[in-house]
Swiss-Prot record:
Matching NCBIfam families: PRK00026.1, trmD
Gene designation: trmD
Record's protein name: tRNA (guanine-N(1)-)-methyltransferase
Keywords: Cytoplasm, Methyltransferase, S-adenosyl-L-methionine, Transferase, tRNA processing
Position of the signal peptide: none
Organism of this sequence: Rhodospirillum rubrum (strain ATCC 11170 / ATH 1.1.1 / DSM 467 / LMG 4362 / NCIMB 8255 / S1)
Amino acid sequence: MSLRAVVLTLFPEMFPGPLGHSIAGKALETGAWSIEAVDIRSFATDRHHTVDDSPFGGGAGMVMRPDVVDAAIAASWPGDGPLVYLTPRGRVLDQALVRELAQAPSLTLLCGRYEGVDQRVLDERGMLEISIGDYVLSGGEAAAQVLLDAVVRLLPGVVGKTESLEDESFERGLLEYPHYTRPAEWRGRTVPEVLTSGHHQKVSDWRQARSEEITQTRRPDLWARYVAARTSLDRGCGQ
């Protein structure tokens, strides 16, 4: 069973874009997932194809109309997966949420523009609001591509080795350890000796230690959650 992705956007020509290349692109070719870009503007009913209007209460910018957006959703939503609105105020996308979304048979993503989308259609449709970070983009298209790339990688058979996924940043609650390849010496910099020792347990221990060190230094928020989870697990095992 493949994932069906539907993207509601004012710029359908932006898709698949980078998703048509590399891992996600190969998965498209093999049928692991599909993508349909729906032009929201085609659901406008006036001769100017108007999709936005000025906000009630005043203020800068324009707001996407609920009637137009809802018509696009009604015509395009497969009905068996979450409706997602990409917005800076949403739940922050993390690996746990990516894993959750990867279990869905379909994902319908609404890409906002201007000042955003009329709140009424978001409430009416019970949309899941997701953010890819604490910054503002010109629209939701780039965010949709980020979300889909993260999700597609977790689909069965898309990434060759399960170990590749398990070792990545965030999968174990830690940032990923450093990687090295040939040549063994480059510009006076050598590969850590333990990695060429052939001792698998020592290599594993080194990688774990580096992951912990990097996480503690660069992402103290992740480190705190990791320590709390590990402490809770240790207590549970001791009961």
